[in-house]
Amino acid sequence: VKLTQLYRGPHFLRGFDDDIREHLATEMRKKGIDLVFNCNIDMVEKKGDRLVADLNNGERIETDMVMYATGRRPATRGIGLEEAGVQLNDNGTIAVDEHFRSNVPSILALGDVLGRIELTPVATTEGMAVANTLFGGKPTTVDYSNVPSAVFSQPPIGSVGLTEAQAREAHADDIDVYLSEFRPLKHTISLNEER
């Protein structure tokens, strides 16, 4: 199988440390995956039993299959929020205060429709904060500063807390950075070089 992955930005996995992003790209290339950045598909047409994708960089890719992942957008338009007076941001997310109340006090929102960190455990934590605030008599806010995130890639990657760039911005050069690579024990037996 030959795989080409296009990404419209300068690199994938926005929000992760640059060295992690670069490491994953290197490992993917070792597996034979062709990565093309700053590129998008202009058009896909069927030619016989194949597909031809015209790219905005002038190249063409002939392939058996195209998967076009366009990102996520909250499905908040046209469900009556505007009629209820709820303020939506330009991207369709719902504007809320620190206790998840919209500008209409009886309407609260949490999870992916906020456009913050779109992870199930974050939405669960937000739901618990709302329950504590409304029913527990304990106004509760959510701290988004140390949310773990994982990508089920090969190799898998994860992070928690600030990226190096964010840490440098917040603490100038008063940080230490240590990098280490290791080969998982299971790979030593199979002679897999993945790190």
Each language-model region and where it sits:
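Rossmann-like dinucleotide-binding cores of NAD(P)H-dependent redox enzymes
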Residues: 1-52, 56-57, 117-124, 132-166
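A short, glycine/Asx- and small/polar-enriched loop/turn
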Residues: 46-51, 104, 191-195
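Conserved beta-strand termini and adjacent loop/short-helix elements that scaffold enzyme active sites
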Residues: 38-40, 91, 178-180
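FAD-site-proximal beta/loop scaffold in flavoenzymes
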Residues: 60-138
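Short, conserved active-site loop motifs that form the nucleotide-linked donor/cofactor pocket
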Residues: 33-34, 107, 175
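Glycine-rich phosphate/pyrophosphate-binding beta-alpha loops
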Residues: 112-119, 153, 183-188
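A short alpha-helix-loop-beta-strand transition element characteristic
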Residues: 87-90, 137-146, 171-178
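C-terminal catalytic lobe of FAD-dependent flavoproteins
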Residues: 59-85, 159-195
